[in-house]
UniProtKB/Swiss-Prot annotation:
Keyword Transit peptide annotated: no
Cellular localisation: Secreted
Subunit description: Homodimer; disulfide-linked. Interacts with WFIKKN2, leading to inhibit its activity. Interacts with FSTL3.
Propeptide intervals in chain numbering: 19-266
Keyword tags: Cleavage on pair of basic residues, Cytokine, Disulfide bond, Glycoprotein, Growth factor, Heparin-binding, Secreted, Signal
Gene Ontology molecular function: any one: cytokine activity
Positions marked as site (Cleavage): R98, D99
TM regions (residue ranges): none
Family: Belongs to the TGF-beta family.
Protein name according to UniProt: Growth/differentiation factor 8
Gene: MSTN
Residues bearing carbohydrate: N48, N71
Residues spanning the signal sequence: 1-18
A Gene Ontology BP annotation from the UniProt entry: myoblast migration involved in skeletal muscle regeneration
Length: 375
């Protein structure tokens, strides 16, 4: 009986020291810990997002071989930008892609052939400079995108000035060749006849795929072309060297090429949104807005989905990376551990002005995070 009384006294003493157990207090402490963890994760993601944006600026300038962003005003862009239908369609295409809120399938369609449009503007030619009577236009240099892919379409676009009365226009495209013994410096490419009504000028396209393919096979034969568009009175209506008020009406080439696929499938990574509570390495959405940067020199896209990686790389989830796991096991204090980083990236196509106020179309590699992982 005395032993039982002693146990009761001890039990009551322990309750007095420990105090009452408040279940609500324990729940609040647990909730505070969870909230603190979520806040830390949000802060970590925000830092990763800011770092990604700054890295994108540096990467674009570096990959375009630009020391600084070209300083071109919006007014200058309006004057220099070609006002032709295919370029407008290309810009509209970027707008459609931008407005599409869906991120597409998680599976890359690298198996199917993709078609790309390349807009090539005329440049200076040493041969044209040597010709005594300066021809009316045009020399085109071709990027590696055109040289190393299959050309499926090539259109020369020219702008015809408006006429005051109905007239028939005879359009002639001539290819420059090295002077022959009889003095001939041209050979015909295409000719066509079209009727024009009074009013605004028109854009006219001419198929030059065969000529372009010959130039690609024999680059030394590419000496330039001459463009003529004579009305019934012998007036040339073709804009070859734009006069004041004709900005953006230069001739140009629209070339469509097929890009050969390299892979068919890829494995998957985690995709999250900004409200996700996922702690593991994950891909998060990030939209880059070039207008917010003040980068008006980028014609298209004005914004694009770049994405970024954030999250923890716990060794519990590293069955896929046995080498990293073994290194950590051998020297846990000396190894920094894996980081959440892009494991697959894809390019973006871009229309932009370079430092010489020339319009360039190019593909910039490694600008979109497609997948994140621990490595």
């Amino acid at each position: 009986m005395q032993k039982l009384q002693i146990f009761v006294y001890i039990y009551l003493f322990m309750l007095t020291v420990a105090g009452p157990v408040d279940l609500n207090e324990n729940s609040e402490q647990k909730e505070n810990v969870e909230k603190k963890g979520l806040c830390n994760a949000c802060l970590w993601r925000q830092n990763n997002k800011s770092s990604r944006l700054e890295a994108i600026k540096i990467q674009i300038l570096s990959k375009l071989r630009l020391e600084t962003a070209p300083n071109i005003s919006k007014d200058a862009i309006r004057q220099l930008l070609p006002k032709a239908p295919p370029l407008r369609e290309l810009i509209d295409q970027y707008d459609v892609q931008r407005d599409d809120s869906s991120d597409g399938s998680l599976e890359d369609d690298d198996y199917h052939v993709t078609t790309e449009t390349v807009i090539t503007m005329p440049t200076e030619s040493d041969f044209l400079a040597e010709v005594q009577e300066k021809p009316k236009c045009c020399f085109f240099k071709f990027s590696s995108k055109i040289q190393h892919n299959k050309v499926i379409k090539a259109q020369l676009w020219i702008y015809l000035r408006p006429v005051k009365t109905p007239t028939t226009v005879f359009v002639q495209i001539l290819r420059l060749i090295k002077p022959m013994k009889d003095g001939t410096r041209y050979t015909g490419i295409r000719s066509l006849k079209l009727d024009m009504n009074p009013g605004t000028g028109i854009w006219q396209s001419i198929d030059v795929k065969t000529v372009l393919q010959n130039w690609l096979k024999q680059p030394e034969s590419n000496l330039g072309i001459e463009i003529k568009a004579l009305d019934e009175n012998g007036h040339d209506l073709a804009v070859t060297f734009p006069e004041p008020g004709e900005e953006g009406l230069n001739p140009f080439l629209e070339v469509k090429v097929t890009d050969t696929p390299k892979r068919a499938r890829r494995d998957f990574g985690l995709d999250c949104d900004e409200h996700s509570t996922e702690s593991r390495c994950c891909r998060y959405p990030l939209t880059v807005d070039f207008e917010a940067f003040g980068w008006d020199w980028i014609i298209a896209p004005k914004r694009y989905k770049a994405n970024y990686c954030s999250g923890e790389c716990e060794f519990l989830f590293l069955q896929k990376y046995p080498h990293t796991h073994l290194v950590h096991q051998a020297n846990p204090k000396g190894s920094a551990g894996p980081c959440c980083t892009p494991t697959k990236m894809s390019p973006i196509n871009m229309l932009y002005f370079n430092g010489k106020e020339q319009i360039i179309y190019g593909k910039i590699p490694g600008m979109v995070v497609d997948r994140c992982g621990c490595s």
